[in-house]
Amino acid sequence: MSEQPGPKAPRWAWWVATGFGSGRLRPAPGTWGSLAACLAWALILALTATPFSSWALSHGSQPRSAILGLALEAFLLALPIAMTWAAVRASDRVVEETGQKDPSYIVADEWAGQWIALWPLRWFLAQNLFRLGRPGGWKILVLMALPFGLFRLLDIWKPWPCHEIQGLPGGQGVVADDVVAGLYAIPLVLVLHPLLEALLR
């Protein structure tokens, strides 16, 4: 569905809406966008939660460790919320400029939903990122891929109310169904991850 093109969107909106360029990749831009979101999440964890985990292990249970841990938890919770907000704003501006309801190159919604799906495994990912190159690292990779696969499946399947909320105006309609898919993925990740981990032992 196309609408009358509107004012030109700022450059930042295009960067965010296209998932920093990942939405330009073909084929399956949504999958590329989700994969890029996973890599960005892993990089953020490698720069924050991974070094904190090592530091906390060496310093034991201290008030300072608890305070830093809470601050880091708040930061990691804020990330998918901030990404959702930015995705709505950016998609709104791009949709307004192009007159296209939900073009395939907009993958900021995949970034938001994927980060929501990844959030439950934040500490598992943080503590195991650097084990990928060690013997048995493929098992860690399989476990890390679980939120990615579940989110992509739910994003394509679109369980209720994903189809209904796609009718919301502008960026809300672009992003809302992916947020719901990410939220649906959370309980599945929490249930399936320990089962898969036990199978891979």
Question: Where in this protein do the model-derived segments appear?
Answer:
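Membrane-interface interhelical connector segments
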Residues: 50-66, 127, 131-132
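Alpha-helical transmembrane segments
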Residues: 38, 42-46, 57, 66-90, ...
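Short helix-loop boundary/capping segments at the starts of domains
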Residues: 22, 41, 45-49, 100
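Membrane-interfacial alpha-helical segments at the cytosolic side of multi-pass membrane proteins
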Residues: 35-45, 113-125, 185-193
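Interhelical loop and helix-boundary elements at the membrane-water interface
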Residues: 2-36, 65-66, 86-118, 130, ...
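Juxtamembrane boundary at the C-terminal end of a transmembrane helix
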Residues: 191-201
